[in-house]
Amino acid sequence: MVRHGTPRTAFPTLFTERRNIMKNTIFTGAAIAIITPMNADGSINYDELGELIDDQIKKGTDGIVICGTTGEASTMTDDEHLDCIKFAVKQAAGRVPVIAGTGSNDTAYAVKLSQEAEAAGADALLLVTPYYNKTTQRGLIAHFTAIADAVNVPIILYNIPGRTGVNIDVATVKELAKHKNIAAIKEASGNISYAAKLIAECGDNIDVYSGNDDQIVPLMSLGAKGVISVLSHVIPAETHQMAQYCLDNNFAAAMKMQIEYLDLINDLFIEVNPIPVKEAMNMIGWNAGPCRLPLYEMSDEHKAKLRASLRKHGLVK
């Protein structure tokens, strides 16, 4: 098995107090939006998930985001969803924070799942904006507030309008940031101007994380605290280092890495996430397995392009 990257020597404090308000920063650096390895029959491969969590932590990953988009939470049963969260908490064993995806377009269900994740030991929750039955900005405030009122762990809002069809307005984030449990936002709109305004107007009361690997350095140069990454699957140490350079204000070194890996990042999203990253993990020696339908096997043309990109960066022979 070819597994690249070198471990870092020490981990920063998992939770650091912000100066301006009494909230905690969940993590700084690079957290992984981790895949859910599957067996050939589509069942969850917990052995491989455990190995992957351990490998990521050893190589410097700063947090584990379980049951997110990349983890195929939308095709999990309720029992599988909660079991994965419990498993990740046990496997991480306090070495890095575990952030559980508990968002839904059903507020009552999101409250229930969030409470269960908290009881299971999740350090924080990731809550996507309601999708399909799209709501207004006032509805978003009511939705997220209902969940935040029901738990006692920090929440990361998840703005990804390309999937949900709704963008969280900066004014809405500013209002939500007044809640003691709403600590951060994963910004995955791809709109740098929006991100800049978000950080400028809300950054004193809420942390911002990049949700796009091709914008790690741009967003962190504006003041984002890190990234929730897919790239970290294949180059965990390097992804951590890129984010760490930003935290150390060494943006020249960080941008050099960002540019170096842009082709790999693009190819990891050549089809709908997480199809390419699971294929990449299989290629480099992990047993990531297939995706669950409706996500379908990658085309041969795209497989060849992805393999060439992995080869260029020394990840496969």
Q: Where are the language model's segments positioned?
A:
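Active-site beta->alpha loop and helix N-cap motifs at the rims of alpha/beta catalytic domains
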Residues: 24-32, 36-165
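A general structural signal for well-ordered alpha-helical segments in protein cores
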Residues: 49, 81, 85, 110, ...
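Short, Lys/Arg-enriched N-terminal segments with co-localized hydrophobic residues
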Residues: 3-21
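Structured C-terminal cap/extension of enzyme domains
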Residues: 214-317
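Short beta->alpha linker loops
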Residues: 102-105, 189-193, 211-214, 234, ...
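Ligand/cofactor pocket segment of small-molecule handling proteins
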Residues: 122-124, 131-136, 140-225
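Short secondary-structure boundary segments
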Residues: 68, 129-130, 188-189, 212-213, ...
